[in-house]
Each structure stands twice: as structure tokens, then as C-alpha cells.
Amino acid sequence: MEILRFLLSLFIYFLLLNLSLSHFPSISAQRTNHENFLKCLSHRINEDDSRIIHTSKDPSYFSILNSSIQNPRFFVLETPKPVSIITPVQATDVQSTIKCARLHGIHIRTRSGGHDYEGLSYMAKSRPFVVIDLRNLRSITLDVDNRTGWVQSGATIGELYYEIGKLSKSLAFPAGLYPTVGIGGQFGGGGYGTLMRKYGLSADNVIDAHIVDANGSFLDRQGMGEDFFWAIRGGGGSSFSVVLSWKIRLLDVPSVVTVFKVVKTSEKEAVSIINKWQYIADKVPNDLFIRAMLQKETEVYASFPGLYLGPVSDLLALMKDKFPELGLEIGNCREMSWIESVLWFIKGESMEILAKRKRTSRSFKGKDDFIEEPIPKTAIQYLWRRFEAPEARLAKIILTPFGGKMSEIADNEIPFPHREGNLYEIQYLAYWSEEEDKNKTNTEKYLRWVESVYEFMTPYVSKSPRRAYVNFRDIDLGMYLGLNMKTKYEEAKVWGVKYFKNNFDRLVRVKTNVDPMDFFCDEQSIPIMKYVNDI
């Protein structure tokens, strides 16, 4: 019996080995494919191709690659590097890249701002690849009279805020807090920030898009169709196409808003106030956004930063009625314009900082959960005490309130499904210095801290499935391995339903229709089915 088991195992091993070897070309064939791809692309590009094509032999290669690695955890020698980087300057360059890549069997990744939590926009773990870096496609055109704008995917949300702020003090757009995040990734996964309770996600306010599909065709909303347009707004746009630009809806904000921050250093008081926050943060008027945060400097503390779309007098009256436990006073508050509030949240001094690009210096690992019922005070107390660990010296736990507009939008309106019924989303983040990445043991202790907090929270978070936000990508949820004879759909459903709930199957249908050869793929991309009717 043991001999039979051994022979069976040996047979399976060689079968899998044969399959893997037949699936990927030899090293020499890969090199030839890449050379032919570059010849094809050079022939198609009308301009000076040195501005667009960068191989490892070029002086520009490493400066371009490294400039947008926004998690230094992957800024190490072991991280797989692209065989070349393409920096298109116009839509036809992207079309040519896709056509040549398909013709010569080249795998691609698309990078906007480089903020993918797991680095999947600029690395691939299983095969040679080319990065399409959209840094040169960053134009922003705003129409204040019609309250719309076009913004290219290579722009950052900071650049978008900057352009809005230059033109108007009474218009805004709902996106994230960190100005260096790329538009392509932010909108493609959903995108939220301080205006989410008032206006929803970034993707909720996208009304058209320009893309290049897997055939190299240039399409707008009408050309791609409503299912395709639905999928790229929150379903991870890079699974379906290269999104070149987005048409957005600009939204009204009052000329005066109020920002505030309250800090609590007493464990007992902080735990009590966070507990109360759970019961009111999603139910207060839509004009009010209050986050709760745990972190550590010299000591552990809780902070409650927020934005109110109105004057301080109205805010103080509202807080006295709805959340007196916080003890908000006029000294905690500042009136300003909305664009100034964007700067306040990042501790910036001038608008120009929004338009500057820089690479972060801290490595990190993040996980997140959605909370449907208030967690017990004992759990909050546990989270506070986890910051006593040495590896939590730079860590953060961020609680972001939902409710408001987020609860008014149907969970299938776009692929982002986390709507009504969610009190808040909670993120667990560990940070460490880039220098510490040189020692794997150092890195592992930070990863374990995040994992331990995540495991502790299991009884208190969403279930069946335990859900997650695709823009906070977590490779621990699963990735394509090609083992156990499972189809890609079977593998992907493990994490796909966590990110997209019941919208996952519709995303698979769209993917199968628009990219049947699975050209746009990564370790957690939307899969295809062999037959659409299999779903």
C-alpha cells in the first residue's frame, strides 16, 4: 500500500512538473519573445521610443521602476523585476503595447501610482513581465460650469485635488486622504475618504471612461457597454483593460468646513469613547465624518480626527447632542475651505504639496475587516494593549465610519458591495523602516503582529464570508497556485467573494466576455470561465 501511495505521488509530481514546463516557454524562448515584442513596439511607435521603452540596460530603467514602489517591503533584490517598462505618452502607445504583447506572448502589469498593498502593479511572481507605467498620462481637465472633469489614470489624487482647489472653493471630489495614490488604482477599486458619507466612493461618481481593451481597441462608455463600464468601477480595473482616463462628477461643498481632532491618552477613557463611537459614527448626519484611530508615539493613544461640512458653531451643537462623550471644544476645531481640509489631514502647509510625488520610506503590511455589530469593550481594550508590543511602535488601527450615502447605494450598483449594514471598516497596519527589510526576521515579527490582531478579531467581524476591501489588497486571502487541479474560478472564488460578495460572479461573466484569453491577469485578478454559462 505504501509503495502504491509513493508511486501515485511520484506520478502526480511529474504530471504537475510536465504541465508547468509546458505552460511556460523556455528561458531562451522568453528572451526571444521579449526581443520580438520590443521590435514590434518600436516599429509601431511614431515618436522617439527612448521616451517610452526602458529596458534594464537603460539608465532610466531603475529610476522609473523604483520611483513608484510605494511599499518598500518590495524594494529588495529578491523582488521580481520587469524585463522592460513602457511609459506611454498617448493612447496609441498603450494600444501598440497591448497588440505587440498579445502577438508575442508577453505578460503585462499596469501601474498608476504604485500603491498596491502587495506590489502586484509592478511585480509578478511566476513569469517574466512588462510594466505599463502610466506616469506620463496624467492630464486633468475640469469643467467647473458643468461640474465634470476628465482625469487620466497616471495622475494622483493629490494632483486632482490641487486642480480642483485652483479653480473653486465650493467644488470637491470624494477620494482618499493620501495625495500620492494613483487615480487608476483608487477609482478601479472604489476609493474612499472624508466625503464618503456625503457622496459615496470615487467610483460612484465616475460617469465615463476611456480604456484600451485586450484587443488593443480604444473604447469609451458607449463603446464598451454598460457591463464592462460597471466592472471597471470598483472591480479592479486592471483585470479587464488599461483604463486611460475617467470622467468624474464634481460635487458641491460649502465654502466653510470645519476640521477637528480630539486625542485621548487614558486607556479607560479612550476605550469608553471608542465604544460609544461605534454606536453613533454611522448614524450622525451625512455632513459629519469622524474616524477613530489607535497608534503609538511615546505612548499609546486614541485620536478622533474629523470633517464637518459646515461652520464650527453647527458642529459643536451637533456633537453636544449626538456625541457629548468626546468632549469636543472649540479649541479642537478649525474653520477653513474644503481644499485646506485636504492639506490639514496630511499636515501639509501649501497646496503645492498636493501636486508633488514622493516615495514612502516605511514598509508596511495591512489587513482589514468590516464590522456589522459593535465589538465588546474588552476587544477594544485588547487592541489598545497590543500596542505595548515592540513591533507596534509605528502601527495603526484605523476605524472608518460608514452609513450616510454609503448605505443609500445598492450593493450591486458597482462591484464594491460593502454598503448598508456595515457600521465601519477597520484596518490593522504595521509599519517598519526600510532598513529592517534587509533582515527577514525583522520583517516577520511585524507581519505576525498584524496577523495576530486579525486572528483575534475573527469572532467580531463580518462572516460567511469574512469580507475585505480590494484596494487594501491582502495576498494572505489567497492567490492563484494552480494546484489540486482546481480551475482559476474555483481558486479565485476563495478571495473573490471576500472582496466582492455576490458581485463576484457577475465580474467573472464580464471578464469572460471582454477578455476571454485572460490577457489581463495577476495573482488575484478576476478569472474567466471556459464557458460563460458555467456560472
Curated annotation (Swiss-Prot):
- Cysteines paired by S-S bonds: 40-100
Gene Ontology CC entries for this record = extracellular region; plant-type cell wall
Q: Which residues form the signal peptide?
A: 1-22
Residues carrying Pros-8alpha-FAD histidine:
115
In terms of superkingdom, the source organism counts as Eukaryota
Report the EC code(s) recorded for this entry.
1.1.1.-
This chain is glycosylated at 18, 66, 146, 215, 439
Pfam families per record: BBE, FAD_binding_4
Please tell me whether the keyword Membrane is annotated for this protein: no
Q: Which cofactor does it need?
A: FAD
Give the protein's recorded name: Berberine bridge enzyme-like 27
What is the species listed in this Swiss-Prot or TrEMBL entry? Arabidopsis thaliana (Mouse-ear cress)
